[in-house]
Structures are given as C-alpha cells and as structure tokens.
C-alpha cells in the first residue's frame, strides 16, 4: 500500500494550468473529504466582458473551480491509494456532470473555499457533494459533481 499523497503533492499534479487553473491551495485531503481554496484574479480577461462595469465571476467557472478543488484532487488521492503506482500516475480525471445551485456571486479578487465530501466511488467513477463559500462563510453555490478516471 502506497503512502498517501500529501496535499501539496496532489496540488502539483493537478493538470490544469493558468489561465485555466482555479485551485491555489488544498488545506485538507482524505479518503472522503477535501478542502481547497482559490483567489479569483481581478485581472483575468473574462471579467472585461462579464459584466463591464460590474464584473462577476461566471457560474461555469465557479463550477470548474469546484471540480478542480474537489473532484480532481479527491480522485487523484483515491487512485493513488487503490491502483498500481504507474497506473495512478497516468490516470486523468475528467469532469463529467454537475447539478449545482447558485445562491450568491463572486467578485474579482475574492477568495473562495470549496469543501467536497465523497458521495460515491467505484470503478474509477466518483461523485462528491461540494459547497463553495466566501471567506466570511456565505455559501455561493453547492451541489453534486462527478468525474471519471481515464488512462492517458
């Protein structure tokens, strides 16, 4: 059985890179729960058009942030735990489904935290219940997200 990956090791392996990387930190990583965070870059190009003079982070990017802070790191952790090392390293997690409700907005420069709890895991498929909050604890969005591991 392999040693569990440390959060910083998982963070280094998350494949997304700027400008499409929406996870800065993993504060907690276990078999059933992961906690991650991201600060939205106020200079990000998408804010120029969404919405001019009153910029708001697009909901689709909030969902992507939830996946990068929750589904991807949790899948990496579980694959590392359950698969041969060479196979786990070649596993790519694809985001497959989301059912998310929005209850707030995120402005440029805000930091969000995502708490994801494992709901289902079998045959390289997983589903989490995720919740995104602002630094003050206000819930921005929550719901179920799913992914699957494929060999790359």
How should each PLM-predicted stretch be described?
Residues 5-17:
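Short aromatic-glycine motifs in intrinsically disordered, low-complexity regions
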Residues 54-79:
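Helix-adjacent hinge/juxtasegments
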Residues 1-3, 33-35, 105-152:
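HotDog/MaoC-like acyl-thioester-processing domains
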Residues 4, 71-115, 140:
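Hydrophobic beta-strand-centered segment that forms part of the acyl-chain substrate-binding groove
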């Amino acid at each position: 059985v392999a040693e569990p990956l440390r959060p910083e090791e998982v963070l280094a392996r998350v494949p997304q890179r700027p400008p499409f990387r929406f996870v800065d930190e993993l504060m907690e990583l276990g078999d059933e729960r992961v906690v991650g965070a991201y600060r939205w870059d106020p200079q990000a190009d998408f804010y120029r058009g969404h919405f001019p003079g009153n910029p708001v982070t697009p909901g689709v990017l909030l969902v992507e942030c939830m996946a990068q802070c929750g589904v991807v790191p949790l899948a990496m952790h579980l694959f590392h735990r359950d698969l041969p090392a060479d196979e786990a390293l070649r596993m790519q997690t694809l985001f497959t489904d989301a059912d998310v409700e929005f209850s707030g907005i995120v402005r440029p420069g805000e930091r969000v935290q995502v708490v994801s709890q494992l709901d289902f895991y079998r045959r390289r498929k997983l589903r989490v219940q995720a919740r995104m909050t602002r630094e003050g604890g206000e819930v921005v969005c929550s719901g179920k997200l799913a992914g699957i591991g494929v060999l790359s």
